[in-house]
Amino acid sequence: MTSLPVLLFLIILLLPSMITEGRVLTQTGKEATIFADQKTNHEADLKNPDPQEVQRALARILCALGELDKLVKDQANAGQQEFKLPKDFTGRSKCRSLGRIK
């Protein structure tokens, strides 16, 4: 049952950042640099996110949560007391290519 709080925490933590990925201001609060081939209204994107991007972000989160849940169960079955996330977990994840946001 400890995996459920971890999963909920990851959803709450990752969802806002995945939806607005690449569309936020820097820490100084200055407007982000816009390249010549990037013609987007960032404020409009933040107010009205593209439903497809939201769907892709949710698909990536659900995929990652499924992999994390499987990893937790595998470690529990192996009798490990501590949860140890492999260093290359994010690099080898099947979810990286799933629903890639522009």
UniProtKB/Swiss-Prot annotation:
Subunit structure: Monomer.
Functional summary from the UniProt entry: Male-specific phermone which is recognized by the Vmn2r116/V2rp5 receptor in the vomeronasal organ (VNO) and enhances female sexual receptive behavior (lordosis) upon male mounting, resulting in successful copulation.
Transmembrane parts of this sequence: none
GN (gene name): Esp1
Species whose genome carries this gene: Mus musculus
Keyword Signal: yes
Cross-referenced Gene3D superfamilies: ESP1, core domain
Family: Belongs to the exocrine gland-secreted peptide family.
Keyword vocabulary terms for this entry: Behavior, Disulfide bond, Pheromone, Secreted, Signal
Gene Ontology biological process terms from the UniProt entry: positive regulation of female receptivity
GO molecular function: pheromone activity
Signal peptide: 1-22
GO terms under cellular component: extracellular space
Compartments, as annotated in UniProt: Secreted
Result after altering R92E: Reduced neuron activity in the VNO
Protein name (database record): Exocrine gland-secreted peptide 1
Effect of K70E: Reduced neuron activity in the VNO
Tissue and organ distribution: Expressed in the extraorbital lacrimal gland from where it is secreted into tears.
Disulfide links within the chain: C63-C95
Site (Required for activity): E67
Source taxonomy: Eukaryota, Metazoa, Chordata, Craniata, Vertebrata
